[in-house]
């Protein structure tokens, strides 16, 4: 009887607690990269929060969504990719250059899709502005300028979240933790995927911090890192 009880308890631990056990190791595994990302969020939270508040978005959820990107952010790599985007993307579009840029690692194609979807949504009228979505260098140059500042990326992040709530009304009925898991997956994988596809993608380990992925590269569930960040920030004061 005792042995059966122990086996049952161990089974429950593995089934229900595995995500907690493994997520608790993220801070140790990422080391200084985690600490630096955490410090960056803490130092900029006061500047970012008014932007998220403007769009009615929970800053804690927004910051958790992009936290994995802050962990693997590289100054020198971003400088090279940003320069390429500014030169090649502006003149030739996302088919010519579509590198992720900025602290939140946003691609021009992502911004294009957000611009277009925003313009077609009821939110554009509610907030009183639209984006220039013409297929020309002026529109692309303006888009790159928005992506080139942390404030601009915060606005794109907030708009992404509002559009996701609009597209998936039942998302708001989930717990905050579940919302983070869903939104982080959509942000990292494909924000235009269906509800079922995004739920399925939550299980995929595709996130890594290596410059180039090899067979030795360790991969993680992007959304679980976001959830860990959210829970840590929710349970402690900033």
Q: What are these language model-derived features?
A:
Residues 9-17:
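Bacterial N-terminal signal peptides
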Residues 19-23:
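Sec/Tat signal peptide C-region and signal peptidase I cleavage site
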Residues 1-9:
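Bacterial N-terminal signal peptides that target proteins for export
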Residues 24-238:
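Catalytic glycan-binding domains that act on GlcNAc-containing polysaccharides
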């Amino acid at each position: 009887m005792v042995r059966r009880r122990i086996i049952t308890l161990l089974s429950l631990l593995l089934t229900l607690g595995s995500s907690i056990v493994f997520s608790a190791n993220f801070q140790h595994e990422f080391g200084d990269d985690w600490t630096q990302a955490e410090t960056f969020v803490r130092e900029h939270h006061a500047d970012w929060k008014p932007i998220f508040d403007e769009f009615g978005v929970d800053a804690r959820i927004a910051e958790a969504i992009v936290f994995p990107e802050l962990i693997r952010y590289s100054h020198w790599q971003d400088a090279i990719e940003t320069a390429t985007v500014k030169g090649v993307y502006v003149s030739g579009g996302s088919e010519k250059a579509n590198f992720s840029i900025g602290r939140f690692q946003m691609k021009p194609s992502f911004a294009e899709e957000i611009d277009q979807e925003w313009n077609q949504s009821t939110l554009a009228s509610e907030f009183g502005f639209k984006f220039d979505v013409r297929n020309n260098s002026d529109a692309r140059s303006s888009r790159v300028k928005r992506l080139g500042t942390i404030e601009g990326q915060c606005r794109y992040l907030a708009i992404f979240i509002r559009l996701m709530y609009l597209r998936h009304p039942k998302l708001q009925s989930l717990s905050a933790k579940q919302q983070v898991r869903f939104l982080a997956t959509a942000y990292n994988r494909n924000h235009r995927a269906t509800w079922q596809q995004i739920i399925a993608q939550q299980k995929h380990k595709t996130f890594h911090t290596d410059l180039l992925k090899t067979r030795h590269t360790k991969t993680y569930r992007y959304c679980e890192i976001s959830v860990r960040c959210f829970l840590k920030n929710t349970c402690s004061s900033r």
